[in-house]
Amino acid sequence: MVMTDPIADMLTRIRNANMVRHEKLEVPASKIKREIAEILKREGFIRDYEYIEDNKQGILRIFLKYGPNNERVITGLKRISKPGLRVYVKAHEVPRVLNGLGIAILSTSQGILTDKEARQKGTGGEVIAYVW
């Protein structure tokens, strides 16, 4: 089956696993999904991730993170730029999510960056998702 938006599929799988408090989940791997998982790990939204080779495209196993009382670290995920409606921003228009409590993930000419990194580098790009 052909998937029209693999990034939205990844975010939905994370959201669903998080809602039922699963420890881990698996998604078909790609370079951009690995970079998004790396940002989520670096920003403290997931515990870890690993790439598993399966002689096809590979699998990305993501380990979710919860607080000491089993509260969710990720309270929301939203896909912004979709295949039917791409959303681009200039360097001075890079959005803040919940006044800095969340992150915006952007695809730029310098790779996949958070909103903070994009502002520091003075670059805009396609707004992939918001995470808070």
Swiss-Prot record:
Record keyword RNA-binding present: yes
Signal peptide feature range: none
Entry-linked InterPro entries: Ribosomal_uS8 (IPR000630), Ribosomal_uS8_CS (IPR047863), Ribosomal_uS8_sf (IPR035987)
One GO-annotated biological process of the protein: translation
Keyword tags: Ribonucleoprotein, Ribosomal protein, RNA-binding, rRNA-binding
Coiled-coil regions listed in the entry: none
GO CC entries: ribonucleoprotein complex; ribosome
Keyword Ribonucleoprotein among record annotations: yes
Molecular function via GO: rRNA binding; structural constituent of ribosome
NCBIfam families xrefs: PRK00136.1 (NF001109)
PANTHER family recorded: 40S RIBOSOMAL PROTEIN S15A
Assembly: Part of the 30S ribosomal subunit. Contacts proteins S5 and S12.
Family membership: Belongs to the universal ribosomal protein uS8 family.
Free-text function comment from the UniProt entry: One of the primary rRNA binding proteins, it binds directly to 16S rRNA central domain where it helps coordinate assembly of the platform of the 30S subunit.
Protein name, per record: Small ribosomal subunit protein uS8
Naturally occurring in which organism (per UniProt): Geobacillus kaustophilus (strain HTA426)
Lineage: Bacteria, Bacillati, Bacillota, Bacilli, Bacillales
Name of the gene this protein is made from: rpsH
